[in-house]
């Protein structure tokens, strides 16, 4: 696994380094990229909500400038995280995904949810602290399952109304309180498409910063039942033969990895590399 990007708790009082600028799920970018000289950004007097030390990219320190409102910077524009997925290398996307999660967490914890007092970053750890009542919050992580259901040479794929036209993907959903991830897999498959599965096999995981999911990937074999798409959640679901697949999710997604991995094992091809 690449070590170009390494998360670390850096002290914002340190000088120099690079910075990414984030606001409302978008990053500032110019013709040179998304990393800006930090000292140059400081001179712009941006509407800074918080500055967070993120870690190191290619050995250089990287910081996050989380803005209160978007700012106009000559020669730069704002761009959403999903666009970067197709444009930058996986290590830089991991950095941006981490920055998104930290920035979202900071912006959503400006005030204490218990007493309403302003919250402050706690020195020495990634935490927001309320000095008035002592409540402490860490970055949020939402565990989610994603599963490829198969029946021999057939893959059960579905599409949400939110997908790009023609794209089908694997099934996914959030883990509910009190259930295991395996229980979540069986429940979500039953809810979304109405079929039963054999016990699922864990494959791999991927951080999914939209804005703070951890995708736990599984494969499950079909056990029985007819496909009945869940109203409002699933626009269409059907079995696809491996020789006649529809448009699939982006290659950087774990959904695509689960599909490509099954095809490789079924057809005796080299296995794909897990996306960062």
From Swiss-Prot:
Q: Which UniProt keywords apply?
A: Hydrolase, Magnesium, Manganese, Metal-binding, NAD, Zinc
Molecular function in Gene Ontology: magnesium ion binding; manganese ion binding; NAD+ diphosphatase activity; NADH pyrophosphatase activity; RNA NAD-cap (NMN-forming) hydrolase activity; zinc ion binding
Which residues hold a divalent metal cation 3?
A: 188, 192, 233
**The keyword ATP-binding belongs to this UniProt entry's keyword annotation:** no
In which residues does the motif Nudix box occur? 173-194
Textual note on the cofactor = Divalent metal cations. Mg(2+) or Mn(2+). Binds 1 zinc ion per subunit.
Does the keyword Coiled coil feature in the UniProt annotation? no
Positions annotated to bind a divalent metal cation 2: 188
Which Gene3D superfamilies would you find in this protein's record? 3.90.79.20, Nucleoside Triphosphate Pyrophosphohydrolase (3.90.79.10)
Q: Which GO terms describe its biological process?
A: NAD catabolic process; NADH metabolic process; NADP catabolic process
Domain Nudix hydrolase per the UniProt entry, residue ranges: 139-262
Which Pfam families does the UniProt entry name for this protein? NUDIX, NUDIX-like, Zn_ribbon_NUD
Q: Which cofactor does it need?
A: Mg(2+); Mn(2+); Zn(2+)
Question: What PROSITE patterns does the database record attribute to this sequence?
Answer: NUDIX, NUDIX_BOX
- Coiled-coil stretches are none
Superkingdom, natural source: Bacteria
Which annotated residues bind a divalent metal cation 1?
172, 192, 233
**Which top EC class is named for this enzyme in its record?**
hydrolase
Q: Which reaction does it catalyse?
A: a 5'-end NAD(+)-phospho-ribonucleoside in mRNA + H2O = a 5'-end phospho-adenosine-phospho-ribonucleoside in mRNA + beta-nicotinamide D-ribonucleotide + 2 H(+); NAD(+) + H2O = beta-nicotinamide D-ribonucleotide + AMP + 2 H(+); NADH + H2O = reduced beta-nicotinamide D-ribonucleotide + AMP + 2 H(+)
Q: What does this protein do?
A: mRNA decapping enzyme that specifically removes the nicotinamide adenine dinucleotide (NAD) cap from a subset of mRNAs by hydrolyzing the diphosphate linkage to produce nicotinamide mononucleotide (NMN) and 5' monophosphate mRNA. The NAD-cap is present at the 5'-end of some mRNAs and stabilizes RNA against 5'-processing. Has preference for mRNAs with a 5'-end purine. Catalyzes the hydrolysis of a broad range of dinucleotide pyrophosphates.
Family recorded in the similarity comment: Belongs to the Nudix hydrolase family. NudC subfamily.
NCBIfam families of this UniProt entry? PRK00241.1
Q: What is this protein called?
A: NAD-capped RNA hydrolase NudC
């Amino acid at each position: 696994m690449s070590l170009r990007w390494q998360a670390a708790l850096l002290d914002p009082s340190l000088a120099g380094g690079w910075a990414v600028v984030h606001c409302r799920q978008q990053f500032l970018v110019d013709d040179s990229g998304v990393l800006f000289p930090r000292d140059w950004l400081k001179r712009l007097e941006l509407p800074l909500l918080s500055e967070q030390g993120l870690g190191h990219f290619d050995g250089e320190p990287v910081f996050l400038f989380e803005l209160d409102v978007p700012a106009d910077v000559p020669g730069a524009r704002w761009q959403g995280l999903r666009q970067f997925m197709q444009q930058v290398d996986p290590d830089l996307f991991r950095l941006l995904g981490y920055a998104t999660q930290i920035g979202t967490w900071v912006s959503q914890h400006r005030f204490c949810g218990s007493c309403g007092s302003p919250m402050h970053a706690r020195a020495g750890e990634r935490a927001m602290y309320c000095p008035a009542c002592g409540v402490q919050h860490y970055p949020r992580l939402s565990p989610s399952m994603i599963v490829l259901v198969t029946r021999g040479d057939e893959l059960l794929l579905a599409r949400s109304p939110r997908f790009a036209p023609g794209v089908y993907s694997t099934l996914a959903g959030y883990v509910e309180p009190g259930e295991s991830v395996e229980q979540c897999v069986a429940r979500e498959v039953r809810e979304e498409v109405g079929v039963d599965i054999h016990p699922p096999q864990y494959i791999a995981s991927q951080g999914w910063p939209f804005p703070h999911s951890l995708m736990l990937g599984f494969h499950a074999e079909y056990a029985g039942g007819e496909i009945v798409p869940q109203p409002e959640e699933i626009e269409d679901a059907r079995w696809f033969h491996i020789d006649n697949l529809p448009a699939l999710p982006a290659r950087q997604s774990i959904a695509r990895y689960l599909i490509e991995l099954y095809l490789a094992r079924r057809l005796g091809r080299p296995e794909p590399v897990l996306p960062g």
